[in-house]
Amino acid sequence: MSEIVQALVIDIGSGVVKSGFAGDDAPRAVFPSIVGFPKHKGVMVGMGQKDAYVGDEAQTKRGILHIKYPIEHGIVNNWDDMEKIWHHTFYNELRVAPEEHPVLLTEAPLNPKANREKITQIMFETFNVPSFYISIQAVLSLYASGRTTGIVFDSGDGVSHVVPIYEGYSLPYAINRIDLAGRDLTDYLQLILTESGNSFTTTAEREIVRDIKEKLCYVSLNYEEDMRNTEHLASITKTYEMPDGQVISIGNERFRAPELLFQPKLRGLELKGIHQNIYDSIMKCDVDIRKELYGNIVLSGGTTMYPGLAERILNEIKALAPPVIKIGVVAPPERKYSVWIGGSILASLSTFQQMWVSKAEYQEHGPSIVHRKCF
């Protein structure tokens, strides 16, 4: 493989696709992982109506489209739509010919074996890639933080995972998947804003709620006290200007929405909070590596971007862990894209070049080769 050909790194999440070139320090293209189909054929006569729209274009036209999310909770559920997203990524966003570049894809922890094989098959047979690799998202985030051992809390739009990793290998028996992530926090914020007299019902308004969440929400270090403390309310209240110029004020909703991560019961969800999930995952690991995991709790993904989250996790884990244990929570500033960045680092290492699954290996062994080479 000549040095000049850059590998492509594609991290497709339940909410957002991050894609670009290995060796770059940030993804080149970031767009929503959605596919939209026109509700009525021929509504846009003379506009060159397409059969399907992907990403930002689907987002802007969503009023006249049926929107589909091909990835739910981190796992592909519709292969035809998924193929459209890959096609769009290669040809429209990155503007590359996939048959000319090695491709590194990411996958959710505990991704079913059949899914890995299907992805491998599509890459080699539909897109004709010369070589391919698939890597677990949380492991890439850990690499991006400069570690090979630690426990990653990775939370995106559709799913969260707690993944303990020892010397570069994830420990599947101790992974916790939590079906609570960014989309649920947006829903919850929409609910509590509606309770305080604002109306957000359309999909466009839902995007506004997501924007409010990303710009104004934070994690409280003492939720019960902050809920009781009415004097403190004036100091935390912020205003938000809607697209139509109307200004709304947001008070304790700012910290009530992300609190769901620690207290899913606030929405009647029978799930454990993220701190409990991190602790449980560490306790499933061998006693000899726990100390190292406690000291290297690494945050990753867009839903870990709230101010106060790292400190709150630290406090909650301190309360659960043995008192002598030193706890470290690492929140890299670029963690929104750390899975992609880890992939970019990995795919450009000279030592990694022998790891790729080549087209010849695929032709000889079929899709199951992926389990032998990517783990």
UniProtKB/Swiss-Prot annotation:
List, alphabetically, the SMART domains matched.
ACTIN
One GO term of the cellular component aspect? cytoplasm
Q: Which keywords fit this entry according to its UniProt record?
A: ATP-binding, Cytoplasm, Cytoskeleton, Hydrolase, Nucleotide-binding
The protein's annotated catalytic reaction(s) are: ATP + H2O = ADP + phosphate + H(+)
A single MF term (Gene Ontology): ATP binding
Q: What is its EC number?
A: 3.6.4.-
Show the coiled coil region(s): none
Return the broad EC class: hydrolase
What InterPro entries does the entry give?
Answer: Actin (IPR004000), Actin/actin-like_CS (IPR020902), Actin_CS (IPR004001), ATPase_NBD (IPR043129)
Cellular localisation: Cytoplasm, Cytoskeleton
State if 4Fe-4S is listed as a keyword: no
Q: Which SUPFAM superfamilies match?
A: Actin-like ATPase domain (SSF53067)
Record's Pfam families? Actin (PF00022)
Q: Does the keyword Cytoplasm apply?
A: yes
Q: Which family does it belong to?
A: Belongs to the actin family.
The protein's job, in short, is: Actins are highly conserved proteins that are involved in various types of cell motility and are ubiquitously expressed in all eukaryotic cells.
Write the protein's name. Answer: Actin
